[in-house]
């Protein structure tokens, strides 16, 4: 699949979607995007900058949600123009989709909304590539129905994203079999390595996380075979205004990415023997 300025799929090198969970300031966005662009160029990984103008699903009303639509889009446009990278942001049911699609290169739908038919189809109709996050409550094979909804809206630039499955209270687990199953949709599969270590609502009024396991799950996903990785990052995650506990530290991003790129090259050069049994 053609995605921004590169090809995405198991026949192509892994790509990275990364940035702070939420837009905190213009300067942080520019600094983070610039550093990510440079390190991705050194490693040889295509890059899409990600950050949100509004986090509508925070645990508490006391949690920081973002800078809002107008200021958020202005900053994303500035990142595009000054840093020269494609940008992605998530949208919600009350988002003016046409306004957002006029600025960003990729639209993302939140996991909680993956079953909302009208929403998925309205996003797909904007003519942008869409990254559909699989709900924490959804089986991987059920993503076929979600993808069908998007395609029926006339969009064939669809990605599906795994971000963990609910396992008891305040805990997520990642079933790597689901990555292979979701390939049967015919869409590039993305693994969200940072939200997969989140502990939803684990701190009462905010979510906890175990960022020390981000490399473990990222390596496992790349070894299983994915088109791309989604990893939120921050220069100082402990001071991040949203999802800091599961964000990967920006100073450690290049070191991790080198390992993942090396592993991706080896795995994709060998092919995927399980495809003989799966409809991929």
Curated annotation (Swiss-Prot):
Pfam families: DAHP_synth_1. The keyword Cell cycle does not apply. It is found in: Cytoplasm. Its main location: cytoplasm. Keywords: Cytoplasm, Lipopolysaccharide biosynthesis, Transferase. GO terms for molecular function: 3-deoxy-8-phosphooctulonate synthase activity. SUPFAM superfamilies: Aldolase. It catalyses: D-arabinose 5-phosphate + phosphoenolpyruvate + H2O = 3-deoxy-alpha-D-manno-2-octulosonate-8-phosphate + phosphate. InterPro entries: Aldolase_TIM, DAHP1/KDSA, KDO8P_synthase. GO terms for biological process: keto-3-deoxy-D-manno-octulosonic acid biosynthetic process. It is an enzyme of class 2 (transferase). GO terms for cellular component: cytoplasm. NCBIfam families: KDO8P_synth, PRK05198.1. Belongs to the KdsA family. This is 2-dehydro-3-deoxyphosphooctonate aldolase. The lineage of its organism: Bacteria, Pseudomonadati, Pseudomonadota, Gammaproteobacteria, Chromatiales. The gene is kdsA.
């Amino acid at each position: 699949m053609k995605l921004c300025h590169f090809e995405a799929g198991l026949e192509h090198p892994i790509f990275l979607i990364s940035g702070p969970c939420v837009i905190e300031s213009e300067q942080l966005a520019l600094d983070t995007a610039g550093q990510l662009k440079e390190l991705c160029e050194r490693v040889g990984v295509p890059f899409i900058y990600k950050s949100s103008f509004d986090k509508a699903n925070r645990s508490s009303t006391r949690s920081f949600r973002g800078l809002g639509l107008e200021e958020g889009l202005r900053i994303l446009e500035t990142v595009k123009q000054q840093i020269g990278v494609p940008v992605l942001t998530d949208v919600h049911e009350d988002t003016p989709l046409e306004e957002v699609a006029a600025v960003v290169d990729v639209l993302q739908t939140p996991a909680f909304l993956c079953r909302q038919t009208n929403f998925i189809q309205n996003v797909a109709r904007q003519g942008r590539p869409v990254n559909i996050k699989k709900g924490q409550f959804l089986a991987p094979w059920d993503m076929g129905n979600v993808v069908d909804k998007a395609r029926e809206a006339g969009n064939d630039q669809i990605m599906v994203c795994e971000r963990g499955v609910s396992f008891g209270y305040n805990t997520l687990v990642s079933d790597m079999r689901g990555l292979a199953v979701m390939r049967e949709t015919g869409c590039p599969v993305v693994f969200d390595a940072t939200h997969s270590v989140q502990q939803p609502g684990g701190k009462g009024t905010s979510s906890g996380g175990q960022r020390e396991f981000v490399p473990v799950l990222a390596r496992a996903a790349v070894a299983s075979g994915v088109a791309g990785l989604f990893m939120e990052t921050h220069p100082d995650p402990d001071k991040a205004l949203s999802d800091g506990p599961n964000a990967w530290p920006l100073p450690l991003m290049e070191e991790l990415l080198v390992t993942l790129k090396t592993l991706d090259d080896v795995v994709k050069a060998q092919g995927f023997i399980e495809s003989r049994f799966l409809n991929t």
